């Protein structure tokens, strides 16, 4: 008699515990985790091209001393998939060994404000 009441309760407990386990989400993997070498990333927006002029000037100057790194730079026109790292565009970011080592975001007045931090990282 007691088994008739216990058996259905055990089935319900196992069924409900299986449901809660299936709702656990795996840890979200960042796109930075896929970058294992020094990589320059530039996030651009054609609607804000006037804000990007110092970035382009800085990149042209940096290309003289670091042509290989600038040539391998990746340019994105959307921040889709990068929301955890990028708040606004334009953004110039240097990633090394899955870590952001330099990030310059938003409106920058002088190209030197971009060149100096990048030179520091790229010269290593």
Swiss-Prot record:
Primary location group: membrane
Membrane topology designation: Lipid-anchor
Superkingdom: Bacteria
GO cellular component: plasma membrane
Signal sequence, start to end: 1-18
Lipid moiety-binding region (N-palmitoyl cysteine): 19
Lipidated positions per record (S-diacylglycerol cysteine): 19
Cellular localization per UniProt: Cell membrane
Keywords for the protein's UniProt record, in alphabetical order: Cell membrane, Lipoprotein, Membrane, Palmitate, Signal
Protein name: Pal-related lipoprotein
């Amino acid at each position: 008699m007691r088994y008739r009441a216990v058996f259905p309760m055990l089935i319900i407990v196992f069924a409900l515990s299986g449901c809660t386990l299936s709702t656990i989400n795996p840890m979200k993997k960042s796109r930075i985790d896929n970058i294992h070498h020094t990589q320059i990333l530039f996030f651009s927006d054609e609607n804000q091209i006037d804000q990007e002029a110092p970035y382009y000037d800085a990149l042209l100057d940096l290309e003289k001393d670091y042509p290989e790194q600038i040539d391998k730079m990746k340019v994105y026109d959307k921040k889709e998939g990068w929301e955890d790292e990028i708040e606004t565009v334009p953004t110039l970011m240097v990633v090394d060994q899955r870590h952001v080592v330099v990030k310059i975001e938003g409106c920058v007045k002088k190209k030197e404000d971009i060149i100096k931090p990048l030179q520091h990282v790229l010269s290593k």
